[in-house]
């Protein structure tokens, strides 16, 4: 079939397309007009409708089979023929297959199918001719049989590819405001908290953290033991049965011998003051010290510590005696001392 669009080509140039459809099917195709889609770039005459209805001369020339010359120019069939062939594609493999000879693959132009309605593509062939092709019926021209209409590369207009709306529509409109507090590894959530209350809580928390914390030292209280006994007259009891409590004073005087051993020689004793109420109860003891400047410790030393201290002193005494320069027996040391004292006394008497 040969078509001349916009007077750019002559009618003498041969063009051939192998058609296997009848003329009755071409007549049944709807004769539509196409509006020029580039009206804002060309002259006012482009707003007219371009008819694709085949003429009588074209129908007579379609009855024969022609070969496409290797001139580099190629013109597709009319829109009505392509539309009619795509409608009859599913009937049979013979009627639905359309073959296009591949004259020159480097000089062919293929239109990309677009799914938008009313969109037309305008191409210029290498030979100088221009043609219009409907994108809904565009087919590749490389000699491949076409069994189905082309697939669109763009989504339909109704589909939504992406959106930038805030995803808060799923939340209910009247949802209560919540306050979440993270403190000491725990999470606390409170409902119905207004922004003003939240700000006030944050201010209180900030002010509370800046306030200095005053810690009072823990007070140690002595345990007071109350002894409850029957009515017993303390004056009738012998003094040996009276309880006594002894305290070791750190400031007490101590006697030291020549070997460096120390012995505690002073202690404090306390007696019970009996304040009998109705002759039945005995109150706690009150310590009485001989001197006011000596303070008795609150806790007495245990007996085990006393025994270990005594053993330590004995061991130290033994070490000191073994290291002394005059390692003599006790008897010899006493004899030497006596002889020295006698010599000193005799010398003093002779001097006088």
From Swiss-Prot:
Effect listed in the UniProt record for changing residue 185 to A: Loss of dimerization and loss of interaction with TIFY9/JAZ10
Record localization: Nucleus
Family listed: Belongs to the TIFY/JAZ family.
Database matches in PROSITE patterns: TIFY (PS51320)
A GO molecular-function annotation: identical protein binding
Record-annotated disulphide pairs: none
Assigned keywords, A-Z: Jasmonic acid signaling pathway, Nucleus, Plant defense, Transcription, Transcription regulation, Ubl conjugation
GO cellular component terms, semicolon-separated: nucleus
Domain Tify intervals: 172-207
Biased composition (Basic and acidic residues): 17-26
Induction section of the entry: Up-regulated by jasmonate, wounding and herbivory.
Coarse class of the protein's main subcellular location: nucleus
Source organism per UniProt: Arabidopsis thaliana (Mouse-ear cress)
Impact reported for residue 180 to A: No effect on dimerization
Motif, Nuclear localization signal: chain positions: 304-311
Modification after translation: Ubiquitinated. Targeted for degradation by the SCF(COI1) E3 ubiquitin ligase-proteasome pathway during jasmonate signaling.
Domain of life: Eukaryota
Name of the molecule in the record: Protein TIFY 6B
Lineage: Eukaryota, Viridiplantae, Streptophyta, Embryophyta, Tracheophyta
Domains: entry comment: The tify domain is required for homo- and heterodimerization and for the interaction with other TIFY proteins. The jas domain (302-326) is necessary and sufficient for the hormone dependent interaction with COI1 and the hormone independent interaction with MYC2.
